[in-house]
UniProtKB/Swiss-Prot annotation:
Acts as a mitochondrial iron-sulfur (Fe-S) cluster assembly factor that facilitates [4Fe-4S] cluster insertion into a subset of mitochondrial proteins such as lipoyl synthase (LS) and succinate dehydrogenase (SDH). Required during the last step of iron-sulfur protein assembly when the iron-sulfur cluster is inserted into the target protein. Probably acts together with the monothiol glutaredoxin grx5. Not required for [2Fe-2S] cluster insertion into mitochondrial proteins. May be involved in control of cell division, especially during the resumption from cell cycle arrest. Belongs to the BolA/IbaG family. This is UV-induced protein uvi31. It is found in: Mitochondrion matrix; Cytoplasm; Nucleus.
C-alpha cells in the first residue's frame, strides 16, 4: 500500500519526501519552475512537462563537514530515480547546515 501511494504521488511530493527523510532536514523549500521551461526544445515530445524543473533550498545537519560540491552530489544521488524517470533539472540555490543558517 505504501509503495503504491509513493508511485501515485507527484514528483514534487516524492522529491520532498525523499530529501526530508534521507537528510533529516530542518528546512526544505522546493519551487516548481517547470512552467519557465515547458517551451524549450528539449521538452518537445516530453509527455508531461509539469514537473521537470525544480529549484531547491535545503538545511540539513547531514551536510556538516561536507563541501558544497559534496552536498550537491549527495542530493543528486538521492534523486537518481527521479532523474532517470524524467526530472530534467534541479537547481540547488542553497544547501546549508543549521549552524550556517544561524
Amino acid at each position: 500500500m505504501i509503495r503504491r501511494f509513493f508511485h501515485t504521488m507527484g514528483r514534487q511530493d516524492r522529491i520532498y519526501k525523499t530529501l526530508s527523510e534521507a537528510l533529516k532536514t530542518d528546512k526544505i523549500t522546493l519551487y516548481n519552475d517547470s512552467y519557465k521551461h515547458s517551451h524549450h526544445i528539449a521538452m518537445k515530445g516530453v509527455p508531461d512537462t509539469n514537473e521537470t524543473h525544480f529549484r531547491l533550498e535545503i538545511v540539513s545537519p547531514e551536510f556538516s563537514g561536507m563541501s558544497r560540491v559534496a552536498r550537491h552530489r549527495l542530493v543528486y544521488g538521492l534523486l537518481k530515480d527521479e532523474f532517470d524517470g524524467g526530472l530534467h533539472a534541479l537547481q540547488i540555490t542553497s544547501s546549508k547546515t543549521p549552524d550556517e543558517v544561524s
